[in-house]
């Protein structure tokens, strides 16, 4: 597994909840509590020719971000179906053989600020 993203910005009431590492599948899931919801970071490394399992969700693209000193772009989507009371947001990017996803229910500006302030 390559580098784990460091969250240099964390909103108030954003706290670590749990993590799970699956060495066989080469993936990591980290969860944070935020205002009675869960924000998750999912990482999958395909470096050992493992089967691709990107979880690309449908939604409206609201931003494409470039992080300073990084070679990849981050796509941010808003996801809401008829049963949701509040929007969810998801950010995706790939760096070489590693797929990253951050998702959860959060205010749009806070979510984008969280993603913009990721470092490796």
Label the model's feature ranges.
Residues 1-95:
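Short, solvent-exposed recognition patches
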Residues 96-120:
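Surface-exposed amphipathic alpha-helical segments
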């Amino acid at each position: 597994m390559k580098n784990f993203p460091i969250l240099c910005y964390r909103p108030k009431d954003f706290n670590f909840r749990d993590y799970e590492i699956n060495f066989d599948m080469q993936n990591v899931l980290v969860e944070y509590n935020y205002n009675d919801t869960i924000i998750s970071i999912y990482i999958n490394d395909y470096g050992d020719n493992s089967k691709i399992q990107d979880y690309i969700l449908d939604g409206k693209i609201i931003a494409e971000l470039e992080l300073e000193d990084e070679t990849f772009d981050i796509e941010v989507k808003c996801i809401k179906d008829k049963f949701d009371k509040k929007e969810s947001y998801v950010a995706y990017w790939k760096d070489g053989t590693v797929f990253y996803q951050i998702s959860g229910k959060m205010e749009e500006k806070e979510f984008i600020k969280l993603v913009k302030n990721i470092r490796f």
